[in-house]
């Protein structure tokens, strides 16, 4: 998906989260309103979210985390890469895809998500019954860097076991290194 977690300016200096951002005082946020570019500081106080900036910011302005891009020989680190790398993967698939549908959505972080609507449309229009989602996970105690792609067996949702088994079989037949991911939160 192409949308990003962040914040919407409410009243005075109040912020409302978009998606589920981790809010820590001192994080730098960026955006732009009718008066120009914004680079402000996030302030969290007992669950209340505010910004610190030299002037008021227009209501409804979206603020996102300032990028802090880092690259080494083994890692690339920056906010929002999960979404952007998923898009890159889909574009690479598009180079050779025949008789398929690739979707770029932009409503996932705002609550509800667009996937149920898109899935219904794709099924009704073309009869497509199965889909893969290209998302980028994080390193956890069960998903290790460099050990292969993560096949999500469950997150907040539980996909059909027969479908997971089919994907695992395809990965094995193709010689793709993979790991099995089991999480209790998040959702693809």
Task: Describe every region a protein language model picked out.
Residues 2-188:
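N-terminal hydrophobic/helix-forming segments and targeting peptides
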């Amino acid at each position: 998906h192409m949308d990003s977690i962040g914040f919407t300016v409410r009243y005075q200096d109040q912020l409302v989260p978009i998606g589920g951002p981790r809010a820590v005082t001192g994080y730098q946020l960026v955006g732009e309103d009718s008066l120009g570019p914004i680079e402000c500081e996030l302030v969290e106080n007992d669950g209340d979210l505010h910004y610190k900036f030299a002037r008021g910011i227009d209501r409804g302005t979206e603020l996102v985390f300032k990028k802090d891009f880092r690259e080494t020989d083994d890692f690339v680190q920056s906010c929002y890469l999960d979404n952007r790398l998923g898009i890159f993967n889909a574009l690479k698939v598009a180079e050779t895809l025949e008789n398929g549908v690739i979707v770029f959505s932009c409503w996932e972080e705002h609550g509800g998500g667009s996937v149920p609507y898109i899935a219904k449309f794709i099924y009704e229009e073309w009869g497509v019954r199965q889909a893969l989602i290209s998302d980028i996970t994080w390193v956890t105690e069960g998903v290790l860097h460099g050990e292969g792609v993560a096949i999500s067996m469950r997150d907040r949702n539980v996909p059909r076991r027969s479908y997971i088994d089919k994907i695992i079989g395809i990965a094995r037949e193709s010689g793709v290194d993979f790991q099995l991911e089991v999480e209790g939160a998040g959702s693809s």
